[in-house]
């Protein structure tokens, strides 16, 4: 399975890059992982709704350039469907059984994803009704993908 994480912005914090590197290494046993970073837009403090839409549109255009025909696109969105770890594992397994060989997971920037990306997605996934920093979300997402593969392989890790 090919899995792309398409995300906005670069991560500068060492503790996050270390965690991303660790989960990327662990996942290499199970899938071909590719992390694609697109440039983020500077978001002014107290940006108006209109400015926010413009920022999301620019970031959305950059994301869209990396979305592949035939890939199953999962966008992370607060209004998406919440799944348990077991349900995410089953979803990944089912996609593979149905012949999907490429999954792309999209993480928006600090103000979220453009509506065009949300419409393009095949599935909207929410990790919580809470908001998380988009940089930290990469680590959380990678850990859950790793957990899903361990569940599907019936290997110890998941409790």
Swiss-Prot record:
Its EC number is 2.1.1.177. Belongs to the RNA methyltransferase RlmH family. This is Ribosomal RNA large subunit methyltransferase H. GO terms for cellular component: cytoplasm. It comes from the Bacteria. CDD domains: RlmH-like. It is found in: Cytoplasm. Pfam families: SPOUT_MTase. Homodimer. GO terms for molecular function: rRNA (pseudouridine-N3-)-methyltransferase activity. It catalyses: pseudouridine(1915) in 23S rRNA + S-adenosyl-L-methionine = N(3)-methylpseudouridine(1915) in 23S rRNA + S-adenosyl-L-homocysteine + H(+). Coiled coil: none annotated. Keywords: Cytoplasm, Methyltransferase, rRNA processing, S-adenosyl-L-methionine, Transferase. InterPro entries: Alpha/beta_knot_MTases (IPR029028), RlmH-like (IPR003742), tRNA_m1G_MTases_N (IPR029026). It is an enzyme of class 2 (transferase). The keyword rRNA processing applies. The keyword Cytoplasm applies. S-adenosyl-L-methionine binds at residues 76, 108, 127-132. It comes from Bifidobacterium longum subsp. infantis (strain ATCC 15697 / DSM 20088 / JCM 1222 / NCTC 11817 / S12). Specifically methylates the pseudouridine at position 1915 (m3Psi1915) in 23S rRNA.
